[in-house]
């Protein structure tokens, strides 16, 4: 038990000058983070601030390019998840990494089950120890129950019991309340207090300010992959934390636009989904860029997938040019002039293994075929026209799309859907993971599309992008529209407050 006897003012884990670079992106730049025994440290920052990369470094999934990690003052190298586990670091993710077809006890002790003297798994000892761990955290379910029989909250308890089973000194909780009910969240808070009393150092990642200020003892703020500030949560307020999160300069100058809005092209009313969103309604005009902002779990991407027919809402009406349309599939959406550029280009956007030109022309084969036969020359011409419009950088259009950079893959996806001649284009995180030059090119092209009368919906987690590109912004929180913001009200602080459910600052409340 010597792991837990450190003084409360001596960090269990220290990360110092940690740097991590991916192709074209510096994810972490000289960041530091200290975790203390018996205390909760909230790691705070916008989407893309470097929180997830930090967690992956601490859990041995990524290795830093520079800097030092110390545990109880001694430098360590965490090359693998096993190294992190052996060092007493465990993570409980928003989506628990457990196995539905195994029992509770098997999930708790997978990889380190007690053994008999003959080397066989000692099932009696495993269930006995599992029962003790579950009792310790107030989990009432049976150790022999299959995980598939449990709800999300109880699966979290299994993950926590697993962390305790390896005598973890550091417990990382990454958005642990995202899928929990109010009652389940309260139970999780009680469990956090139990872990604190046991001397665990807890890294708590959340976008919800109310829970940060309720359970955290310390805070650390990252912004754009860099350390901003840390300290005691009792020494700051929500206003100060918001300013630390968003107080950065815009990366580049966004294109100037003189929005000339046309008639209403899309109307959404009463959209609802059993688990993702409810009460959604908005309109969109030709030539308009409508931004959607929100935090993790807000339901933005899920709403866009419903608009495009990937999923079906349980209720709601879609009108296009004033006429009610029923969209049951992506084909229905495309036929009605709605296209969707997804966030996950590799899985949903491009077809790896096919050449660039075929990726661009896939949804438009009717335009490049005659009597059921493809006309290769027409297919190449269509692909070349849109590739040139987007300044697609490729050695040849017949090369595998998988060989392109992220930015150029994004251009292929946009070209593919523009070739269908849509009325509405939905861009989900259009510049995520691409370099600054490609970002600027995508922004210029978005402005050009709007200028030509195309209606654009942009989902983005980057506040400068949302403000710099949008005519209006709809902020979503927990599956509902929290606010619609435009004009002088469109500020970083306003967006963060609405997204996190924070009341306006006193000076901004009208008299």
UniProtKB/Swiss-Prot annotation:
Give the EC number.
7.5.2.7
Alphabetized Pfam families for the sequence = ABC_tran
Q: Which SMART domains match?
A: AAA (SM00382)
- What is the membrane topology listed in the Swiss-Prot or TrEMBL record? Peripheral membrane protein
Cellular location(s): Cell inner membrane
Give the reaction(s) catalysed.
D-ribose(out) + ATP + H2O = D-ribose(in) + ADP + phosphate + H(+)
Write out the entry's keywords from A to Z: ATP-binding, Cell inner membrane, Cell membrane, Membrane, Nucleotide-binding, Repeat, Sugar transport, Translocase, Transport
Tell me, in a sentence or two, what this protein's role is: Part of the ABC transporter complex RbsABC involved in ribose import. Responsible for energy coupling to the transport system.
Q: What is this protein called?
A: Ribose import ATP-binding protein RbsA
Q: What is the lineage of its organism?
A: Bacteria, Pseudomonadati, Pseudomonadota, Alphaproteobacteria, Rhodobacterales
């Amino acid at each position: 038990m010597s792991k837990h006897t450190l003084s409360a003012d001596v960090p269990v884990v220290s990360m110092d000058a940690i740097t991590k670079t991916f192709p074209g992106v510096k994810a972490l730049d000289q960041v530091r983070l200290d975790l203390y025994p018996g205390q909760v440290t909230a790691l705070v920052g916008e989407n893309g601030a470097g929180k997830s990369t930090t967690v992956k470094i601490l859990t041995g999934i990524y290795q830093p390019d520079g800097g030092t990690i110390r545990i109880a003052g001694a430098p360590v190298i965490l090359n693998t998840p096993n190294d992190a586990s052996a060092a007493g670091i465990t993570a409980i993710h928003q989506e628990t990494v457990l196995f539905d077809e195994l029992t509770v006890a098997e999930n708790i002790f997978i990889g380190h089950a007690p053994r008999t003297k003959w080397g066989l798994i000692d099932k009696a000892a495993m269930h006995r120890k599992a029962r003790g761990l579950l009792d310790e955290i107030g989990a009432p379910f049976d150790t022999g129950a299959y995980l598939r029989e449990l709800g999300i909250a109880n699966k979290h308890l299994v993950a926590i019991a697993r962390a305790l089973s390896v005598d973890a000194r550091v417990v990382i909780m990454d958005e642990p309340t995202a899928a929990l009910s109010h009652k389940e969240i309260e139970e999780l808070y009680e469990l956090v207090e139990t872990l604190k009393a046991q001397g665990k150092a807890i890294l708590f990642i959340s976008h919800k300010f109310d829970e940060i200020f309720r359970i955290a003892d310390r805070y650390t703020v990252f912004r754009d992959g860099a350390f901003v500030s840390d300290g005691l949560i009792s020494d700051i307020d929500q206003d100060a934390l918001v300013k630390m999160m968003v107080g950065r300069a815009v990366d580049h100058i966004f294109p100037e636009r003189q929005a000339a809005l046309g008639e209403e092209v899309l109307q959404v009313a009463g959209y609802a989904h059993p688990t993702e969103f409810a009460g959604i309604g908005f309109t969109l005009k030709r030539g308009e860029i409508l931004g959607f902002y929100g935090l993790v779990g807000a339901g933005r991407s899920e709403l866009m997938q419903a608009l495009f027919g990937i999923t079906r809402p349980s209720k709601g009406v879609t009108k296009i040019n004033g006429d009610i349309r029923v969209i049951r599939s992506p084909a229905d959406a495309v036929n009605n002039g709605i296209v969707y550029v997804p966030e996950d280009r590799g899985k949903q956007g491009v077809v790896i293994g096919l050449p660039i030109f075929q990726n661009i022309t896939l949804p438009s084969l009717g335009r490049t075929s005659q009597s059921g036969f493809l006309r290769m020359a027409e297919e190449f011409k269509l692909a070349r026209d849109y590739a040139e419009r987007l300044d697609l950088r490729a050695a040849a259009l017949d090369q595998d799309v998988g060989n392109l950079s992220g930015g150029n893959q994004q251009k292929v996806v946009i070209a593919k859907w523009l070739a269908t001649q849509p009325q509405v284009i939905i861009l989900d995180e259009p510049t995520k993971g691409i370099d600054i030059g490609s970002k600027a090119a995508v922004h210029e092209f978005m402005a050009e599309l709007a200028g030509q009368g195309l209606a654009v919906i942009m989902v983005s987690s980057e506040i400068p992008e949302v403000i710099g590109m949008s005519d209006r912004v709809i902020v979503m929180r927990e599956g509902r529209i929290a606010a619609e913001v435009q004009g002088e009200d469109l500020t970083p602080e306003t967006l963060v407050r609405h997204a996190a459910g924070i009341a306006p600052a006193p000076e901004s409340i009208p008299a």
